[in-house]
């Protein structure tokens, strides 16, 4: 396993190990070609290699990931060790755990309070955005000792508003949640600006420092569920606290 020159996107305001992946640098083939990190449809062998490459690029091992069966809900999981849970956000204060969120149009949110040693990661589709998954993640980070004004947050690549057409039923739920400012009307069609909505929600939660990638998942560099009619891979957004000197692997969940 090697990870030479693995192309990863980094947020300039996050001072802990982290990355937003693209589809470049991996070994998957076919519609998943590249750095696909989801093994539900792809051959699990190249996916395992892709995950190992990503972990190595950040100084972690392939079994350090804390992952989720994401269900477009608002459950925030406190991951005290690597493992696999159901939910749509993760928080931890445990060094050596690499939080991972999978996306292919939904927005990944990465958060860190380096002073407190607390990090978080969230999956924000339209349902999670309406449910304020970013704010809920901040709240759980505060429970672990973080302070909102010290949190640095990054909004990674996702489907841009110009490409994200939705039905009136979805737009109505956005408006009912107080997010009508991010419902866009384009030539008689309705779109959502998920990046703008999540940025505003994180600001409303008191987050002191925000960065937005501005990249759209429908670009060729990324996997996109909508662009590829569902037959596609997944990027991961990952964030971790480095192990302390002399620390070995934690017990597995």
Curated annotation (Swiss-Prot):
Family per similarity comment: Belongs to the purine nucleoside phosphorylase YfiH/LACC1 family.
Keywords linked to the UniProt accession: Copper, Hydrolase, Metal-binding, Oxidoreductase, Transferase, Zinc
Function statement: Purine nucleoside enzyme that catalyzes the phosphorolysis of adenosine and inosine nucleosides, yielding D-ribose 1-phosphate and the respective free bases, adenine and hypoxanthine. Also catalyzes the phosphorolysis of S-methyl-5'-thioadenosine into adenine and S-methyl-5-thio-alpha-D-ribose 1-phosphate. Also has adenosine deaminase activity.
List of residues binding Zn(2+): 72, 106, 123
InterPro entries, per database record: Cu_polyphenol_OxRdtase, Cu_polyphenol_OxRdtase_sf, Cytotoxic_necrot_fac-like_cat
Entry keyword annotation includes Transport: no
Molecular-function GO terms, alphabetical: adenosine deaminase activity; copper ion binding; oxidoreductase activity; S-methyl-5-thioadenosine phosphorylase activity
Protein name: Purine nucleoside phosphorylase DR_1966
Reactions that this protein is recorded to catalyse: adenosine + phosphate = alpha-D-ribose 1-phosphate + adenine; S-methyl-5'-thioadenosine + phosphate = 5-(methylsulfanyl)-alpha-D-ribose 1-phosphate + adenine; inosine + phosphate = alpha-D-ribose 1-phosphate + hypoxanthine; adenosine + H2O + H(+) = inosine + NH4(+)
Keyword Ubl conjugation: no
Subunit structure: Homodimer.
Record EC number: 2.4.2.1, 3.5.4.4, 2.4.2.28
Species of provenance: Deinococcus radiodurans (strain ATCC 13939 / DSM 20539 / JCM 16871 / CCUG 27074 / LMG 4051 / NBRC 15346 / NCIMB 9279 / VKM B-1422 / R1)
Cofactor(s) recorded in Swiss-Prot or TrEMBL: Cu(2+); Zn(2+)
């Amino acid at each position: 396993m090697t990870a030479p020159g693995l192309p990863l996107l980094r947020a300039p305001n996050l001072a802990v190990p982290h990355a937003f992946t693209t589809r470049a640098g991996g070994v998957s083939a076919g519609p998943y070609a590249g750095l696909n990190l989801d093994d539900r449809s792809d051959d699990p062998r190249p996916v395992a290699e892709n995950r190992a490459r990503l972990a190595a690029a950040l100084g972690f091992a392939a079994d350090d990931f804390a992952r989720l069966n994401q269900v477009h809900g608002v459950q925030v999981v406190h991951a005290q060790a690597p493992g696999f849970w159901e939910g749509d956000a993760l928080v931890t204060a445990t060094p050596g755990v690499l939080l991972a969120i999978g996306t292919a149009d939904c927005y990944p949110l990465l958060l860190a309070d380096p002073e407190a040693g607390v990090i978080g990661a969230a999956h924000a589709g339209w349902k999670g955005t309406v449910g304020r998954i970013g704010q809920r993640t901040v709240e759980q980070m505060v429970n672990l000792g973080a302070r909102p004004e010290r949190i640095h947050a990054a909004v990674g690549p996702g489907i841009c508003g110009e490409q994200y057409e939705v039905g009136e039923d979805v737009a109505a739920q956005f408006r009912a949640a107080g997010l009508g400012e991010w419902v866009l009307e384009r030539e008689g069609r309705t779109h959502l600006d998920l990046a703008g909505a999540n940025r505003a929600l994180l600001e409303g939660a008191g987050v002191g420092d925000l960065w937005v990638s501005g990249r759209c998942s429908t670009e060729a560099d990324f996997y996109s569920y909508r662009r590829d009619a569902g037959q596609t891979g997944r990027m991961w957004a990952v964030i971790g606290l480095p192990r302390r000197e002399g620390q070995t692997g934690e017990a597995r969940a």
